[in-house]
Amino acid sequence: MEEHHSMTVAPKNMAILVGGGPAPGINSVISAATIRGIIDGVDVLGIKDGFKWIMRGDISHIKELNIDNVSRIHFRGGSYIGIARENPTKDKKYLENVVTSLLRLNVDKLITIGGDDTAFSAMKVENLAAGRIRVVHVPKTIDNDLDLPHGICTFGFQTARHVGVNIVKNLMVDAQTTSRWYFVVSMGRKAGHLALGIGKSAGSTLTIIPEEFPEETIKLKKLVDILVGAIIKRLSSERPDGVAILAEGLVERLDPKDLEFLLNIERDAHDNIRLAEVNFGEILKFHVQDELKKFGLKATIVAKNIGYELRCSDPIPFDMEYTRDLGYCAAQFLIDGGNGAMISIQEGRFVPMYFNDIIDPLTKRTKVRMVDTQSEYYQISRRYMLRLTKEDFDDPHELAKYAATAGISLDAFRERFYYIAESDVWQMPDLNPNKFPRKINPVVNQEISDEENTVKPVSEKLPHETGKGKKTK
């Protein structure tokens, strides 16, 4: 009988790393993925501080993950294995070091957790590994700006919104109590999802996001006039208080002529402006108060940034459950031989979104999801904001109130502020029921026959059974 000799091959490991900024739910992904891998006999390694060390060829910053040390971390914010914004795509040598380091650690399965920059890095690592390492990405950001299908949020967003709403709720009470305005600048990068989510949920006086401006660049003066107009409108109702939520992404869209204050602003490893370092709220406060003085008006304004206090909050149950699904599916996808995809849960089912399908053909990077200002979600939020609209300028009585508050004529008020309403993308939500014709459900149009104990469609009944037609003697 022929003998078969087999070589003993060391079992391959699965590695997990976290890039970008913190978001509630990271630990739940780590926990779920680790437990799923270990149950299948796979050893799991936590790569500390994202790509920071392995892109330099240093494999000493590793934490062995097991059921004992991850089974309860899902309750907590932060990252059990640290986090970093280090960018391995800046230099091919860094990418080569990442792949080599993982191979030295006997890793053939990699789970990355992060936002659009980390997703791009994961895609580059997968390409360079050429099948030696299978890679899957779990989308994470409080900004909610990854290109997932409509209605599906990135993990961490719901918790960040929840915490942000509680902060704004307290500011709204403080504003009313002390007769002042708060200008709250919310994190969110280029998109306005977080600012709008907080503002709409809390019922803030108004929320301004970059997506509402159709023009490529936004004039600082226009932002100032929107805020001044809202304050005047509020004052006309004898309310000297309010809370304005401002998306930090507005900064990147400002006219270059208004960007002198950004010349020395620090950028991160992915060349993004550190928007949280821009004192945007204070800049707007200064200009708004200066404009109000021209009308003989005065407002106490306090500028506040929110973002850092949201990122490491303990996740709410929604994000704990959601990230458990994401972590499980990420590990299972790799165990089953999957590769090169971003994890998503759509209509309760796992759907891999392959890297090649989520790349923007123009930027060659992962696509960024912006707020759809044509959606009823946005249009309804605008309906509850207090800011100057075209309707205001069509109502002579309201217009007279605003002009009187500003101490100028109706014509002067119109000339000064109408342009901000004229160029506005907002429109009344169209919920006319005629847009939604009723569908006939055949089951509803049925009755049960007592004689036969069977369902008989109305259309099949005889005239005397329906009460229609003449009875014959």
What role is predicted for each listed range?
Residues V44, S101, K109-G114, F120-K124, ...:
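Accessory alpha-helical/coil subdomains and C-terminal extensions
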Residues M1-M7, I54-L110, T118, I142, ...:
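Glycine-rich oxoanion-binding loops at beta->alpha junctions
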Residues G19-G21, V42, I47-K52, R85-E86, ...:
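Short, ordered loop/turn segments at secondary-structure junctions
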Residues A23-A33, I54-M55, K92-E96, I113-M123, ...:
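Short glycine/serine/threonine-rich phosphate/pyrophosphate-binding segments
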Residues N13-I16, I73-R85, K140-I152, T177-S179, ...:
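Gly-rich Lys/Arg/Thr-decorated short loops/hinges at beta-loop-alpha junctions or inter-strand turns
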